[in-house]
Amino acid sequence: MNESNRSKRRNNRKRRTKKKRSALSDLLARNPHAAWWTGGIAVMCLYVWLFYSFFVSPTGFRWRALYGDANYPAGYEIHGIDISHYQGDIDWDKLRGGMIEGYPLRFVMIKSTEGSTRVDSKFIENFLQAREYGYIRGAYHFWSNLSSARSQAYHFLNTVQLEDGDLPPVLDVEHKPADKSIEDFQRDVLTWLHIVEDKYHVKPIIYTYYKFKEKYLNAPVFDDYPYWIAHYYVDKVEYKSPWKFWQHTDVGRLPGIKGFVDFNIYNGSYYDMKKLTIGNQEGVW
């Protein structure tokens, strides 16, 4: 196609565009309310797109959750929950009788700290009660991009006193700073892991969404740590590498807890999980 024909096509497109703009202007002039409706719909579409991009897509959300479908995975016998101040005051007597798919609760993961200064307001109570009621308990630290890895690690160690029979310490990491390279971010995460590992002589558990791990914690060194995968409302784990725990829903219901609670399963037997605990690890890797 030569330049003359291209020029004619461009001129024709311009004339058609002007006609369309003129027709749209006439329509809006005759019906001013249409402008409000058009603008409102555009803003709503933008809002939905932004919400999906930043909150839905990264976590693998499934719309069935809106209907309260906890979607219990089949074939697993060791069930547990993770809790924080969001669950409020827990009635542990009632919780002790709670069952998931006919199986009793075996373990409880408890939020302890966040960043370099925050302590969950229900941590001490939940941590003591979990041991008192016979659950295998664990404590997790919620990673913050606003504090150094070293300060966060020592904040966790100064707050949490894990004992023999407890699960290894847990690092919950879900966000990478936008202004930091993947290599620097991985170095920070490893700093936290190494400091805490030196204290307890066990490898901490890493909790995160599987897409986040594949994108930001994909270095082989992270495969040496037990993985607690967050992957909601699916029938099976899509992550191909080994994992220990699976948080499969955030809309679980149990007696003794008001509102929703996260449900988890352990990938193995109760005996296997006991071997994972502090003071009982003998070649579990």
Task: Please provide the spans of the model-predicted regions.
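Hydrophobic membrane-insertion alpha-helices, especially the h-region
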Residues: 33-56
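Flexible, glycine-rich phosphate/dinucleotide-binding loops
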Residues: 117, 146, 213, 236, ...
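Substrate-binding cleft of extracellular glycoside hydrolase catalytic domains
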Residues: 59-68, 72-91, 96-193, 197-199
